[in-house]
Design a protein with these regions (language model features):
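Active-site-adjacent substrate-binding region
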Residues: 234-251, 258-260, 306-307, 316-365
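Flexible, glycine/charged-enriched surface loops at secondary-structure junctions
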Residues: 20, 49, 159-162, 245-260, ...
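Midchain, well-structured core segments that form catalytic/ion-binding scaffolds
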Residues: 118, 124-134, 170-293, 297, ...
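Short helix-loop-beta-strand segments that form the rim/entrance of peptidase-like active sites
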Residues: 151-173, 254
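Zn-dependent metallopeptidase/amidohydrolase metal-coordination segment
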Residues: 267-269, 342-395
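Active-site metal-coordination/substrate-binding segment of hydrolases
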Residues: 68-159, 187
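A non-catalytic alpha/beta surface segment that caps or lines the substrate-entry region
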Residues: 23-69, 73-79
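N-terminal capping segment at the start of a domain
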Residues: 2-29, 128, 315, 372-376
Length: 403
């Protein structure tokens, strides 16, 4: 088995699901298990300055052979999404995929009808799940790509500048860059390897916020509830109905933003709703937050102040921080071309650690991994594309940017 695939399969065997309800960093102590494994692997490879922080940020350096080039960083995250279990991942390799529906198990099928991109993967070697968990390509494919590219550079006779590597916790819950030590990392610029389809390159992302809504009802015996009971579930339903139905993830694409109710729990007495708010336009992002605030205000008048709203900005569109440094965009595009990859600049409908790091003074656009259908049982990754991503990362190091 190729080292790239071997690495990936090993990394996804670690359960590293981040936990939004936790106040610790990392949010799940199991993230340390993968971090310690990677720490040892880095040391065994001979990387320098290997350091694992108390908050599960892992850093390392590949010393350069050309001191006239700027220092480049590569970053991926170790956690997987809490949207689905990342425990006991049972991957299956499909060689020379035929481009048809993929039966995951007796109940679930990754179908061409639902996922038209599958036709583009015909002839690829791919890795899929057994339908009981996510795969973890987001972003353990990125980790495997970086580690393999670094090892290849070390074994080559090529010239490259200093290269920094970092693997972070809790990206999936919007905290991956919170405690990232930009000074320790000491790169002039960096790339997250956390994208999707072959050739996709992203330096524009959503502005993002989370919203937590708490609704206090009044539970009274249903037989004597007239003019007394206040059902918090019904208030929650009413609140959701006030938001634009056409501004939901399932009805939007491209640069269209949305409100997404991604969790709800409640009973008559008490309910909680959790939304994420997204838009590429900062103006429209602010309008969406204001709209939700006004909806809550309206219902608080109607229901005697029973609703509490907490909105927290998570990250912002990195575009304005990348535009002054377009040489790093040009470097990525040239490196893809040399790897035989047709590049496509897209506005990602998500966020990466790089979006926050760009606002901390580390310009950090996003490279592809070959992963698809993140955060669920239909997640898959193309080994064929991962290999091209490895070549792209190697080329970035080799070409570099002169000081």
């Amino acid at each position: 088995m190729e080292k790239l695939v071997e690495r990936f399969l090993k990394y996804i065997s670690f359960e590293t699901t981040s936990d939004e309800s936790s106040d610790t960093c990392p949010s799940n102590p199991k993230e340390f298990e993968l971090a310690r494994y990677l720490e040892k692997e880095m040391k065994d490879l001979g990387l320098k300055d290997v350091y694992l922080s108390e908050n599960c940020y892992l850093y390392a350096t590949l010393p350069g052979t050309d001191k006239n080039k700027k220092t480049i960083g590569f970053i991926s995250h170790m956690d997987t999404s809490p949207d689905m279990s990342g425990k006991n991942v049972n991957p299956r390799i499909i060689e020379n995929y035929d481009g048809k529906d993929i039966k995951l198990n007796e109940e679930f099928v990754t179908s061409l009808k639902d996922f038209s991109f599958l036709k583009d993967l015909k002839g690829h070697d791919i890795i899929v799940t057994d339908g009981t968990s996510l795969l973890g390509a987001d972003d353990k494919a990125g980790i495997a790509i970086i580690m393999t590219a670094i090892e290849n550079l070390m074994k080559s006779n090529e010239k490259y500048g200093d290269i920094k590597i970092a693997f972070t916790p809790d990206e999936e819950i919007g905290r991956g860059a919170d405690l990232f030590d930009v000074e320790r990392f000491a790169a002039d610029f960096a790339y997250t390897v956390d994208g999707g389809a072959e050739g996709e390159f992203e330096y524009e992302n959503f502005n993002a916020a989370s919203a937590k809504i708490s609704i206090q009802g009044k539970n009274v015996h249903s037989g004597s509830a007239k003019n007394a009971m206040v059902n918090s579930i019904l208030i929650a339903m009413e609140l959701n109905s006030l938001l634009p139905a056409d501004q939901r993830p399932e009805h939007t694409e491209g640069r269209e933003g949305f409100f997404h109710l991604n969790d709800f729990n409640g009973n008559v007495e008490y309910s909680q709703m959790y939304y994420i708010i997204r838009d590429h336009s900062f103006e429209k992002f602010e309008e969406k937050k204001k709209f939700l605030e006004e909806a809550v205000k309206f219902l608080n008048i109607k229901y005697d102040n029973r609703i509490k709203l907490e909105i927290k900005d998570q990250y912002y569109n990195m575009k304005e921080k990348i535009l002054p440094h377009m040489e790093i965009v040009d470097l990525a595009l040239e490196s893809m071309e040399k790897a035989g990859v047709k590049s496509e600049i897209i506005a990602t409908r998500g966020g990466t650690d790089g979006s926050q790091l760009s606002y901390k003074g580390l310009p950090c656009p996003n490279l592809f991994t070959g992963g698809y259908n993140y955060h669920g049982r239909y997640e898959l990754v193309s080994i064929t594309t991962m290999k091209k991503a490895v070549k792209t990362v190697e080329n970035i190091g080799k070409i570099g940017v002169e000081k």
